[in-house]
């Protein structure tokens, strides 16, 4: 049972709000954009390209994002990435106002969105230890993880109904969710940065060699990588929702949410 004192910590509560609305916006985007593109083109490869635009930037920028988070104010990094994502949601609403005319614009906006998201994970994870005491850290991590998992489950379910009710205007709603996240991170009391020794590329290479040669770490990471790659088949769910089950966007939202229910 989490300590009640933990929820009296204003910064920690704002941190939870930040994580909730970031998760809701990201999962809602996945439901909405997959539905709209497949509804317009009927091509499974277009869904595959959505997956690529979401994962390639995160893989390509993982070293850069880590360096930036280590050397820049994390709240400022989060603010900038949230603004970029919010602008891409508004741009998607504008591009799709008359339906899908050119998917290349959608892919470009998703690529920009994913480049910004590559900096969110390292920033949001590294900011938590500075918001709570060492004695409360384990509880704070547990609560934050549970809240995030719940939000990623509820997000697709709610997004399906929002998509059914508002169609392409759902992207304005997703942008408003990101606006709440921006307000939360702006009100957050950022912990003081700890001065760290400058890292060199030699340190990166040593880390990779360590992972490769460690008989416990490498297999564990490989299994996790394989599971994540197989999880990418979720982008194909619009095919099942639209062509096979014919359940509509609300059904698609439920299908994307149902695999997370057991985790919660």
Locate the predicted segments by residue.
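Alpha-helical transmembrane-bundle signature of multi-pass membrane transport and export proteins
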Residues: 1-264
């Amino acid at each position: 049972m989490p300590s009640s004192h933990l929820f009296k910590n204003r910064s920690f509560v704002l941190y939870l709000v930040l994580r909730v609305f970031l998760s809701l916006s990201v999962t809602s985007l996945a439901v909405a954009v997959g539905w709209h593109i497949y509804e317009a083109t009927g091509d499974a490869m277009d869904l595959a390209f959505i997956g690529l635009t979401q994962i390639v930037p995160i893989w390509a920028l993982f070293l850069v994002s880590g360096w930036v988070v280590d050397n820049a104010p994390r709240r400022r990094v989060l603010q900038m990435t949230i603004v970029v994502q919010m602008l891409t949601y508004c741009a998607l609403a504008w591009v799709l106002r008359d339906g899908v005319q050119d998917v290349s614009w959608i892919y470009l906006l998703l690529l920009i969105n994913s480049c910004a998201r590559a900096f969110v994970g390292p920033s949001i994870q590294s900011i938590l230890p500075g918001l709570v005491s060492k004695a409360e850290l384990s509880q704070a991590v547990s609560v934050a993880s549970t809240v995030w998992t719940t939000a990623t489950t509820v997000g697709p379910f709610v997004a399906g109904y929002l998509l059914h009710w508002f169609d392409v205007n759902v992207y304005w709603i997703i942008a408003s969710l990101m606006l709440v996240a921006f307000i939360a991170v702006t009100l957050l009391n950022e912990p003081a940065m700890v001065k760290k020794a400058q890292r060199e590329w030699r340190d990166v290479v040593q880390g990779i060699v360590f992972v490769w040669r460690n008989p416990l770490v490498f297999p564990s990471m490989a299994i996790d990588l394989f599971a994540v790659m197989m999880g990418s088949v979720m982008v194909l769910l619009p095919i099942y929702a639209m062509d096979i089950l014919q359940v509509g966007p609300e059904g698609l939202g439920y299908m994307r949410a149902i695999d997370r229910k057991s985790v919660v």
